């Protein structure tokens, strides 16, 4: 039997089957079924190129490479751009993904390695130019993994589909534990179907083994996509793992029954990640095969930056007038006494603490926003929720590099930064009281500079490279002395991607304005927010010292041009007799000339708009952000009221 439909991919891994490799991607269908995609035919590979600059007269001997036990095939060469100029690049196929690091190590020193540290599952998204939302068609097969549908497909059976709000199933839980003995006293879980909005509530007490068995059975029976709770990364997941391991000792069946939360077969053995049991390693977030662990504490911390990060504080911050959405009055520091005196109240308290994380996640729109970021960055949900910013940027940049014959260097291969990059310009604040202050902001300051000055790893002019601009090509020279190719000679990957993201955001903003349906408006809002997040992440990643497509001159040049722009405008305003009372990185605070004016409010607004328009340039567009009738500061930077 065949099945086709749209799915949202949550997470993935690979499995070795004989001599071949199968990708396993877990997803939730638009029609609500849980789906496992088993993708066949994708071969693991990396690329090599000779060390140093390329000279046509050089001989290349591939015997060392082809003689390696792990190597199955070599393709090429294809001429690709590298930081040392255009060079021949060979694609080396190996038997299994886990063989790539060993083969890289054996070739290190003799060859320059490219595309050698890209997780194998990412190849589904990169090679197919796919995102988390895809349309698939394949043969339905039986599977030991606990899913509604298992499909056997190839890359040709998957194609892009427009993003849609996936009907995820969410499992939110909480534990109450003994302070004296570390044992689990009770547990609670709330399961939500985001397709229907329905919730079911469950509580557990009794002996510890029974609690863990029933909680695990609830997970496996309800097949959630996302596991959440408050501070589960630092407490609840670890406590389940510790207690289940202590109880089960070497009894595998008991271990499965008490902590087998993964969306994988209970007969599976030998994996260290993406497995049946919760694992963590050195990462912040926990890892489960087929599910995304998404801590509400971490999401609230990122979204709200609250003064305190406790569940009580965050709940009160978000729901100050709703008594049903506050923590109950139970003293967690005396949990043993509370449990002995009023167990029913503690169970109710536990259930409340299991449900509040769901309410918080919806209030801060964490589920839909992470889904939107995944859709824009073209990664699985789990990468959006728990991955790094560089992983999101990698997804966009690497696929463009692959399609434009640009070699992909290894992470950490860039020159190390010798010191911190000088940041944005901060104009000393003038102490005192100032009336009618117009605030001007640079629109997307760093992205605009990167576009306007064509700043990219691929456009930086390096004397050590064989790839140099033509004699008549104009160059962009930054205040630091670094030089970049003109777009007439080479358009950078980063400016191209940023322009594309800006265009996407304009489309979604227009969609928000034109939407007559609240759900459509919400969709466009989430998407434009996700695009904004990604655009603003580019500078931080490319100015870092660890990213693969970077050089210290990139970040230095961006901030230098930004400082030059803002200082130039401040000087011109001063020459005109205007009074700048403060500026900080991408904002300028200008006092409006209102002497003898009847309506200073209207004058300030008109002054703000006209000043922004006068000083806007292609790579430095100013906007009138707002105005202050009164601005006061005691003279300290970043400290003012208005």
Which residue stretches match the model-derived regions?
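Active-site palm subdomain of RNA-directed nucleic acid polymerases
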Residues: 323, 565-585
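Catalytic nucleotidyl-transfer cores of nucleotide-processing enzymes
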Residues: 116, 123-136, 283, 296, ...
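Common nucleic-acid-contacting/processivity interface regions adjacent to the catalytic cores
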Residues: 3, 18-20, 132, 333-453, ...
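C-terminal polymerase-core module
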Residues: 591-642
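N-terminal accessory regions of nucleic-acid-interacting proteins
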Residues: 72, 83-165
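Conserved RNase H-like, two-metal-ion catalytic cores of nucleic-acid enzymes
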Residues: 1-69, 144-228, 247
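Active-site-proximal helix-loop-helix substrate-binding element of RNase H-like nuclease domains
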Residues: 199-203, 223, 227, 237, ...
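A short acidic-Thr-Gly-centered motif at the start of a beta-strand
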Residues: 157-166, 220, 422-436, 571-573
């Amino acid at each position: 039997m065949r099945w086709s439909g749209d799915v949202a991919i949550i997470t993935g891994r690979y499995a070795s089957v004989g001599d071949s490799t199968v990708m396993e991607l877990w997803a939730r269908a638009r029609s609500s079924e849980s789906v496992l995609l088993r993708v066949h035919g994708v071969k693991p590979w990396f690329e090599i190129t000779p060390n140093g600059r390329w000279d046509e007269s050089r001989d290349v001997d591939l015997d060392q490479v082809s003689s390696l036990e792990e190597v199955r095939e070599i393709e090429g060469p294809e001429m690709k751009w590298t930081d040392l100029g255009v060079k021949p690049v060979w694609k080396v196929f190996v038997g299994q993904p886990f063989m790539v690091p060993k083969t890289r190590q054996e070739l290190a020193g003799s060859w320059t390695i490219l595309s050698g540290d890209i997780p194998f599952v990412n190849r589904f998204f990169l090679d197919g130019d796919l995102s988390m939302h895809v349309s698939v068609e394949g043969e339905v097969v039986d599977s030991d993994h606990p899913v509604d549908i298992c499909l056997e497909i190839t890359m040709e059976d998957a194609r892009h589909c427009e993003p849609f709000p996936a009907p995820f199933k969410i499992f939110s839980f909480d534990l109450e534990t003994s302070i004296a003995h570390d044992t689990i006293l009770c547990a609670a879980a709330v399961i939500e179907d985001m397709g229907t909005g329905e919730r079911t509530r469950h509580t557990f007490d009794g002996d510890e083994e029974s609690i863990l068995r029933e909680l695990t059975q609830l997970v496996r029976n309800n097949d959630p996509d996302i596991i959440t709770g408050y501070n589960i990364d630092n407490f609840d997941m670890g406590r389940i793992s510790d207690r289940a391991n202590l109880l089960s000792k070497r009894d595998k069946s008991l271990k499965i029954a008490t902590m087998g939360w993964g969306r994988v077969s209970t007969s599976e053995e030998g994996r260290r990640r993406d497995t049946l049991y919760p694992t963590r390693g050195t990462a912040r977030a926990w890892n489960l095969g087929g599910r995304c662990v998404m801590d509400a504490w971490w999401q609230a911390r990122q979204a709200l930056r609250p003064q305190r990060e406790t569940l009580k504080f965050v709940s009160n911050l978000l729901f100050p007038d709703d008594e049903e959405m506050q923590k109950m009055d139970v003293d967690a520091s005396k949990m043993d006494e509370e449990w002995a005196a009023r167990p029913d109240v503690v169970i109710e308290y536990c259930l409340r603490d299991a449900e509040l994380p769901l309410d918080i996640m919806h209030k801060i729109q964490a589920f839909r926003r992470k889904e939107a970021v995944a859709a824009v960055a073209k990664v699985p949900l789990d990468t959006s929720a728990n991955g790094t910013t560089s992983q999101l940027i990698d997804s966009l940049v690497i696929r463009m590099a692959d399609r434009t014959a640009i070699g992909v260097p290894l992470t950490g291969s860039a020159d190390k930064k010798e010191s911190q990059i000088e940041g944005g310009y901060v104009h000393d604040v003038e102490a005192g009281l100032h009336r009618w202050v117009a605030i001007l902001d640079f629109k997307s300051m760093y992205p605009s500079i990167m576009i306007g000055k064509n700043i990219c790893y691929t456009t930086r002019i390096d004397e050590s490279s064989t790839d140099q601009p033509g004699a008549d090509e104009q160059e962009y020279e930054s205040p630091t002395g670094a030089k970049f190719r003109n777009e007439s000679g080479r358009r950078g990957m980063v400016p191209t991607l940023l322009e594309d993201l800006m265009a996407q955001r304009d489309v979604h903003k227009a969609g928000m304005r034109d939407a007559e349906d609240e759900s459509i408006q919400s969709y466009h809002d989430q998407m434009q927010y996700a695009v904004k997040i990604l655009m603003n992440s580019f500078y931080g990643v490319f100015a870092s010292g660890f990213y693969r497509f970077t050089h210290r001159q990139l970040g230095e040049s961006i901030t230098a041009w930004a400082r030059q722009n803002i200082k130039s405008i401040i000087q011109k305003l001063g020459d005109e007799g205007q009074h700048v009372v403060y500026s900080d990185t991408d904002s300028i605070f200008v006092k409006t000339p209102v002497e003898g004016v009847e309506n200073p409010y209207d004058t300030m607004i008109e002054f703000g708009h006209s000043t922004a328009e006068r000083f806007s340039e292609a790579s430095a567009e100013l906007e009138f952000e707002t105005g202050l009738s009164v601005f006061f500061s005691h003279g300290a930077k970043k400290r003012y009221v208005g």
